[in-house]
Amino acid sequence: MQLFSVISTSTNEEGGCMGKINIGRVILGGLVAGIVADILGFLVDGVLLGSTWNDRMQKLNHPALSSTQLIELNLLGLACGIALVWIYAAIRPRFGAGVKTAIYAGLAVWVVGVLIPNLSFMCAMGLFGRRLAVYTTLGGLIEIVVGAIAGAALYKE
């Protein structure tokens, strides 16, 4: 337990008074986080890795993503951004406001929302190859952490 108490930078004592989460700011910051992550995701997966994704999808006899699927993925990105800023708001009393806490929130979302699914579905099942899995997973890290920083910058209690 000593390790975890060293990581925390909060000056609040356990059971101290915490402010309420500002839901309006969570939504605003979350939408910004989601938009930033979606744009970066397009650059990583659509531009840099687009031909590799298309080749892999063809090998699986799966058509390219439709406009409807792209819209759905972007809506999921917005929902992920809102969840991310909510996590930031929830851990902010313990770690303090700022970039470091936004990075912690981004890492938490990345581990659960990108790393674990990509390891299981892309690597363990061998569907898309390790190279694509590694690149898209590392791209996801950048997308989510940068989105977290942008979204957290708008959050105020």
Q: Model segments located where?
A:
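Short hydrophobic transmembrane-like helices used for membrane targeting/insertion
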Residues: M1, V6-I7
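Juxtamembrane/disordered regions of integral membrane proteins
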Residues: F4, N12-E157
